[in-house]
Amino acid sequence: MSKFYDPSQPEQSYDSPKLFGIIPIKFIVSFLQLVSIVSQILWLYSENDKIYLVLLSVGIVLNVFTVVVFIKEHKLLMRAHYYSALIFTVVPFIYAVYTFISFIELFFGDKDITFNQCSPFAYAFIFLCIYIFYLAMCRVLIKASEFQPDDMPDLDTTQGLFHYNRDAYDGGERAKLMYGEV
């Protein structure tokens, strides 16, 4: 019976990392990126200011580029996206702190608190948690891609399905053949 995967050659097959051993992290990262693109497109249709339209259009193009980078697994651009997103974590963090401070002022104030007044803090906190989760998943994906070889080795399919023939590619004149000479 022919083998599709040779366990002595782990570089022939690259298994992506999984969250809790079930969900591929690449799927999670791509899903979160697509949700971001869809939300930006919806925001684009609700916005009337031309400056925001240009900024949202540029953001959509950059997010589509990022999705392609992560699908193609371009290591350098994945790292560049991760580090720039890490730097821009300051923006949602500052917004979350601002909404927390306004929530504290509201909580210790004299007025009654309603859910509508608490919801901006809750939304900011949920967004910040999802953003940090996204960055953590990107980091795991980048770490896993560092162990993946850039070029998969050549496979010799003439002597069996996906059996790696080291002797045929090491520069030697003689290769060991699995079949007899004719």
UniProtKB/Swiss-Prot annotation:
Is Transmembrane a UniProt keyword of this protein? yes
Entries under InterPro entries matching the protein = DUF5373
User: Could you list the residue ranges that cross the membrane?
Assistant: 19-39, 51-71, 87-107, 118-138
Highest taxon of the source? Eukaryota
Q: Which UniProt keywords apply?
A: Membrane, Transmembrane, Transmembrane helix
The residues the entry assigns to the signal sequence are: none
Q: How does it sit in the membrane?
A: Multi-pass membrane protein
Q: Which GO terms describe its cellular component?
A: membrane
- Pfam families, per this entry? DUF5373
Q: Does the record's keyword annotation contain Membrane?
A: yes
What subcellular compartments does it reside in?
Membrane
Name under which the protein is recorded: Uncharacterized protein C48B4.10
